[in-house]
UniProtKB/Swiss-Prot annotation:
UniProt protein name: Fosfomycin resistance protein FosX
Naturally occurring in which organism (per UniProt): Listeria monocytogenes serovar 1/2a (strain ATCC BAA-679 / EGD-e)
Domain of life: Bacteria
Consequence the record notes for mutating E44G: Almost no activity
Keywords: Antibiotic resistance, Cytoplasm, Manganese, Metal-binding
InterPro entries according to UniProt: Fosfomycin_Res_Enzymes, FosX, Glyas_Bleomycin-R_OHBP_Dase, Glyas_Fos-R_dOase_dom, VOC
Subcellular location as annotated: Cytoplasm
Origin organism lineage: Bacteria, Bacillati, Bacillota, Bacilli, Bacillales
Amino acid sequence: MISGLSHITLIVKDLNKTTTFLREIFNAEEIYSSGDQTFSLSKEKFFLIAGLWICIMEGDSLQEQTYNHIAFRIQSEEVDEYIERIKSLGVEIKPERPRVEGEGRSIYFYDFDNHLFELHAGTLEERLKRYHE
């Protein structure tokens, strides 16, 4: 029986650059670094973001950008603060897309390896309520 999400692994070219990205934007807590050892496919680091285990492993970047993404929930009053955090790292923020009223704002941005992230100021319940009106 599935009891929840275990972890998410992202393959990245530069572990240190991605560490800065995760810490500065998501307040990620680094809980493990393999250093020069390899226990899995390559060098790796583990982080906690809001209790979620995120693993980054050294490897080739994604060749292209897609809409596949990981979304984290933030509060609506934090949107502008997060936009500034993201911009401070030189990361491009995608233009906001049109939203259904009541859906909540989102910030979409790619990391240095073409992984798309979303910071969303809304909940599933709010979205479903709006869609059923």
